[in-house]
Amino acid sequence: MGRACGGRRRAAETEDIYAGAGPPARHAHEVRRRSGRAAAAAGTGAPVRKRGDEMSKKATEFQRKAMSWMYRGKENFKPLNTGWIDGNVACVREWVANIFFYRRGGTTLMIDAGYNYDRLEEKMGWLGIDPGEIRHIFITHQDTDHVGAVEADSPGLFRNAALYIGETEDRYLTGAARRRVIYRLYALPQVTVDQEKVLLRDGQVLDIGGIRVECFLVPGHTWGHMVYLIDDRYLFTGDTLWLGADGGYSFISSLAEDNRLALRSLAALEEKLRVRRLKPLFITGHTGWTDDFSFAFAHRDRLCSPFRRRVHDPAAPYDAYDESDDTESGAKCGFLEKVRVHR
């Protein structure tokens, strides 16, 4: 387990944001929690969920079919193929989403857990990463394309890993809040996770095997979305930042809990990095990476709309759910290119 070595108090405005997202989290950082059937078995009173109630496999199949049809030709999604960004960061492609791994010394951290995806272990093998060695998984947010591999109906590749997740985001997992999409018109089924959890706060800093992980709360896409700054060099942004051909935007508008809040959060993130003169690699969940600070925040005051071609990248595949070009030979052939800048 990681060792906490610092942190900052949340601003009052940020605290107020969560008033409507469910009751306050009861457990402080470093308190491990379980949910679903495991919690019920432990006598916590949490509801016992039947296997048929769990959404991961159903949601994965829905996205593969329906969303593939919806987003074809939109030039929105541009995931990285499986491979290495540099000597420390690797990724696995799962259709439109990426899972990331950060390796330094003898420690490997995993950032997000993707879909409930049948080929994950195979593709990790392309990178020389054994699922059994993963002990720490940092979750940016609880959507099923970011937690699928650790949901209750997953194959259980990471049973030995602890999940690090924002204490506010955990409200979705406990059922205290419901995740809403399509401009908050539709409530998604509850995600069920039975693994140990470490609840994180804004500004928390962890030391895990000599690796420094700093947590930034960036609510908007979800109420408790976190981004993770690792060793002051790599910023894993989840679904906060969308890289188009002409720069970064706030993430897809139709999928946010609160778009105005998402814009404010992105602006606040830029300011934090600028004040500290940090220029990390910006590594996104669906649209690749860039090391260009100005490019990353070029349109931080604008939302990405999947129905407007002005937020697009002509280099994006026609159908990002078609991963036929994601191959083992490609994963072992050099480093993955960053997003090309189109001025």
What are these regions (language model features)?
Residues 68-73, 78-80, 167-219, 223-295, 306:
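Metallo-beta-lactamase
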Residues 1-49:
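Compositionally biased, low-complexity flexible segments
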Residues 56-60, 64-67:
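Eukaryotic low-complexity, intrinsically disordered regulatory regions enriched
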